[in-house]
Regions:
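Juxtamembrane "helix-exit" motif on the non-cytosolic side of transmembrane helices
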Residues: 36-46, 103-113, 176-183, 228-233
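Transmembrane helix-loop-helix hairpins at the membrane interface
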Residues: 126-276
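Membrane-embedded alpha-helical transmembrane segments of multi-pass integral membrane proteins
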Residues: 62-63, 102, 174
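Residue-level signature of transmembrane alpha-helical entry/exit and packing/kink sites
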Residues: 18-26, 52-60, 88-92, 122-126, ...
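N-terminal, membrane-interfacial amphipathic/helix-forming hydrophobic leader that caps
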Residues: 1-79, 224-277
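Juxtamembrane helix-loop-helix connectors linking adjacent transmembrane helices
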Residues: 43-56, 71-140, 144-156, 236, ...
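Hydrophobic, membrane-facing alpha-helical anchors
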Residues: 3-16, 81-86, 116-120, 167-172, ...
């Protein structure tokens, strides 16, 4: 049966079969949804901004459902949102939250050089889009890809490090598809870079906390803060003080994450892969 971590017991064949059936059903439903929205491109509203939010939210939620079922099928114990020691895990992740919150152009919004032009329903659906992307990408790239890579080889801190590099590189490279929608080459390269870094940071948090929901929250907040003004407003996002603060914070948290990673003992990950509490 399924425990609080969302993981099936890893041995009984019957449970595996149930998860296999569930996975096939969810995949079939998700495939239909993706076909309807990505190929059919339905117009749910004449407002192009809202229509984009609707489409992204529905398709990413469908994709997330597939990968959450697969996490259960694999038996990875990362889905308990209040897994003990929760408060210690939250404390460990605080520097990462500082990074993602700093992605919001706080100073430009405060001094008026940036401002929002949309609110209300637009803001609600923008939040929904950010959450759906966080759910989908964290389930796929941390909950499945990273944990599958790490499961095969995790005898040392070096193994844990290279698992993160491999999974984060794939996560970054997948953004090359944005070139197909006429995104600028420079913009895509920049997106690959910060996707690699945010992926690596979330990977360390997952290793240390065994809590995928913290990764989802980090990812969603990062996307929300970074895209708020471009999506729902206008103005200058980067000013000199913001750049200086961002660089200092990025360097400090990078050092923190590297030290944290190499202090993680490989056996700590046993609680993700088996029934160790």
């Amino acid at each position: 049966m399924m425990n609080l971590d969302g993981a099936a017991e890893r041995t009984p064949d019957k449970t595996k079969k149930l998860y296999r059936v569930a996975a096939l059903v969810v995949i079939a439903i998700a495939a239909v949804i993706l076909a309807v929205f990505e190929i059919g491109k339905p117009v749910l509203t004449e407002d192009t901004l809202l229509n984009g939010f609707y489409t992204m939210t529905v398709t990413r939620m469908a994709g997330a459902a597939v990968f959450f079922v697969l996490i259960g099928y694999q038996g990875y114990r990362v889905l308990n949102p209040i897994r003990k020691p929760f408060w210690r895990s939250l404390l460990v992740a605080l520097p990462a939250f500082a990074v993602v919150i700093n992605n919001l152009p706080i100073l430009p919004l405060l001094n008026g050089t940036a401002h929002l032009t949309h609110s209300g329903e637009y803001l609600v659906w923008y939040v929904a889009e950010c959450v759906s992307i966080g759910l989908f990408e964290e389930a796929a790239f941390r909950g499945i890809l990273l944990l599958m890579i790490c499961e095969k080889k995790r005898a040392s801190s070096k193994d844990l490090f290279w698992s993160i590099v491999k999974a984060s590189a794939v996560f970054g490279a997948i953004h090359l598809v944005n070139l197909l929608i006429n995104a600028s080459f420079g913009g895509v390269i920049q997106q690959i870079g910060y996707s690699f870094l945010i992926g690596a940071m979330c990977s360390v948090v997952l290793y240390k906390t065994a809590n995928l929901w913290l990764c989802v929250l980090l990812h969603a907040v990062y996307d929300f803060c970074g895209g708020l003004v471009p999506a729902l407003g206008e103005g200058i996002i980067w000013d000199t003080p913001t750049i200086v603060i961002t660089v200092i914070l990025a360097v400090a948290v990078t050092i923190y994450m590297v030290v944290l990673l190499f202090r993680i003992k490989p056996e700590e990950l046993d609680r993700i892969y088996d029934k160790t509490p």
